[in-house]
A protein has these predicted regions:
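Secretory targeting and sorting signals
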Residues: 2-30
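Aromatic (Trp/Tyr/Phe) and Gly/Pro-enriched flexible surface segments
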Residues: 32-280
Length: 280
């Protein structure tokens, strides 16, 4: 389905992860480059651990709880990081990393064309290595606009720009309804997605405008390209809601992507347009 160069990917199995696993079973990426580390789950993430990860982007008054709506059986797909990377964290000491491979790879040196992990499991909605992270949130009174800051990073740059199948990041409120079409008619339907570029496309290596990908923005990470820091917004009502963040691969299980997420906030706005714009 992809170009032959896909075979160059370094695929890391569950038995060969380059991490240190402590008594709690939590993976920690070790690095002497800068202070901080990346702490990921041990594969079977509890609701308590998911909530800890979620609360890196907002406090307990906003993030009531969190869990996975879907996740692949292998790979450390979610992490809380105190390691400064690409301008994160934005506020507070930590931020969230979600991946469709292994979040612990984020600060590895970029020494090859690609580094990834086959996270396994069956296809979900036609996609592979699907991570769907669900947060139960509470919107304060008087606020009607949700803002979420993030940066999408990928190993698919530049080899797979303008390819039909790509990793993608999607953000939805209250329901997650995105779906993919099979090989032969490749497309993604995501009517509720509010993390889109200026043309309404999902965030991927093919995004345009403020959400376009280049190599410079991924400096200091294992990834070959990244977007600017973006702010995705959508209208919302006060009270309880669910926020779904999804990252997946539509075509293969090899070249992986991640999203750094921080600073979930709410404001009162006369106009609150769906979509992602530069936050730099």
């Amino acid at each position: 389905m992809r170009a032959a160069s896909r075979r160059r990917a370094t695929i890391v199995g569950a038995a060969t992860l380059a991490v240190v696993v402590g008594a709690t079973g939590v993976g920690v990426a070790q690095s002497g480059k800068t202070k901080g580390n990346i702490v990921a789950d041990a594969g079977q993430l509890s609701r308590m651990e998911a909530t800890k990860i979620a609360r890196t982007i907002a406090g307990p008054k906003v993030i009531r709880s969190a869990a996975f709506a879907a996740r692949p059986p292998y790979g450390r797909v979610a992490a809380r990081s105190t390691k400064p990377l690409t301008g994160f964290p934005l506020s507070g000491p930590s931020y969230m990393i979600l991946s469709n491979g292994n979040a612990l790879f984020a600060d590895d040196k970029n020494t090859g064309p690609a580094k990834g992990q086959n996270a396994g499991g069956p296809a979900i909605r036609g996609a592979r290595d699907v991570t769907i992270f669900r947060m139960n949130i509470r919107v304060p009174k008087g606020r009607n606009c949700l803002d979420l800051r993030f940066r999408f990073l990928t190993e698919e740059f530049p080899e797979f720009v303008n390819e039909e199948f790509n990793d993608a990041f999607i953000a939805e409120v209250d329901q997650t309804t995105w779906d993919t079409r099979p090989v032969g008619d490749p497309s993604i339907e995501a009517d509720r997605n509010f993390a889109t570029d200026t043309k309404g496309n999902r965030i991927s290596v093919n995004a345009v405008g403020d959400a376009s990908v280049n190599a410079k923005r991924a400096k200091g990470t294992t990834y070959d390209g990244a977007t600017r820091r973006l702010r995705a917004s959508t209208r919302i009502t006060p009270g309880g809601h669910r926020l779904y963040l999804s990252i997946f691969d539509q075509g293969d299980r090899q070249y992986d992507s991640a999203v750094f997420v921080d600073r979930l906030s709410f404001r009162k706005a006369a106009v609150c347009e769906n979509g992602a714009v530069s936050d730099e």
